[in-house]
Amino acid sequence: MSLIVVRTHSFILFWFSCCWRVCFIQWIRKYSIPMADMGRRDSASALLDASENKNHLWG
């Protein structure tokens, strides 16, 4: 009887940890990737501004 209880609890714990991990990864992707894209966009716009300034200085 105790073996059945242990297996059931370990099975429930396994599924809970899997679901938690999937939800956590999705949360990380949802909130960290837009920040990274924003950073990339900012650096790209900074490079564009720098090239425009260089073209403006050279004529």
UniProtKB/Swiss-Prot annotation:
Transmembrane stretches, start-end: none
Claim: Secreted is one of the keywords in the record: yes
Cellular component aspect of the GO annotation: extracellular region
Tissue-specific expression: Expressed by the venom gland.
Post-translational modification: Contains 1 disulfide bond.
Top-level taxon in the UniProt lineage: Eukaryota
MF GO annotations: toxin activity
Keywords, alphabetical: Disulfide bond, Secreted, Signal, Toxin
Subcellular location: Secreted
Protein family membership: Belongs to the scoloptoxin-23 family.
Protein name as it appears in the record: U-scoloptoxin(23)-Er2a
